[in-house]
Amino acid sequence: MKHIIILGDGMADLPIQQLNGKTPLQYANKPIMDKLAREGRCGRLITVPEGFPPGSEVANTAILGYDLNKVYEGRGPLEAASIGYEMTEDDFAIRCNIITLENGRIITHNGGNLQTEDARVLIDYLNEHLAKDPDIVRKYGEGRVQFICGIQYRHLLVIKGGNKHIICNPPHDHPNEEWQPLLVSPENIERPYNQEDLETQARLSPTETAELLNELILKSQELLAKHPYNQEKAKRGERQANSIWPWSGGYRPSMQTLMEQYPQVKSGAVISAVDLIQGIGKYAGLRIIKVPGATGLADTNYEGKAQAAIEALKTDDFVFVHVEASDEAGHDGDLDLKIKTIEYLDQRLIKPIYEAITAKGEICTSSDEEVCIAVLPDHLTPVELRIHVGQPVPFLIWHKGIVADEVQQYDEVSCVNGSYGLLKLHEFMQALMEY
């Protein structure tokens, strides 16, 4: 049997008074998801193990069945893989947002919806004027710092010999909060450090890494304020992309491919606009399919993603489709948009995939070949909180001939009564691979 996972990032939520105590999933018009839940089996899944941040890098890796205690190295290395940066043993790669600060507070984690073409100009500017800053070079050595352009506001910072034992604060978890108390700090892990270590690019201590990152943050604000892009934004009274914000870093991970973990998977593909998910896919040995017009926002090319998934299922036996839009709506606190993204996912992506799977000869060429569909979010991104929440998420599993349970619609409340009950982490993939 072939398998497709369709993941609506941050799609789950909490009850909202404005919706008479319903969640966006309960309120949204999503007949295909409800049909799959009614005809399939449902449950809830713990996607964030104790002690880990409730981020997409954690939850999506766990959903694919990996042991986070063995493979987790943060977002940075995964996004490096997607961008095509080959990490060395001494590299420390960390996600680097370009964000908006106003009046001493974090206003947006996305630099005022910074576009990739503008971001590329700013990243080049930072490489020329910040990575080569005389004070940085004098203190930490030449070639220590490199910025790498990603997509929109999501970029990468690589520090040769950086130390991962630091405490960072994701900017999307702290909207409207003062930024200075959120600067990087070291974990309480230290070791002796000397000039010879610096010259051979051995690892900095946690304290030195934190100090370097904080210095880069402060200097970036001075530089970005002077850039013509932000000066024009200021004239128009628009939000500026006026600070870098590094978070979630690590070293090069060691991961088995999905095919090594699950022998029944012979080949697979991942479809996502997000570097992080593409990076997980690369380490998992999945083929990366990039869809034109896939933005990671509500205006993404749902139909293009659906068609790409249908084509992938003709040749691969595992497809992972990730849609970011509902997460961004949650971070923006936009209830109406979050509901729309759920409905778009249902009608513009899941519906055509379901119709292709159930159409005779469209995907499956023989009567004994079937496709199993799973739908779930990775975590909650409640619109009233605007941050990630690591509570259990609802999931459904459907295929022709599955024995349905009593769940009648797909949402956080209904799936509590699903026949799978409450699963933990890798148990989801185990359940999926039973078919």
Annotated model-derived regions:
Residues 1-435:
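Feature captures the catalytic ectodomains and active-site-proximal regions of enzymes
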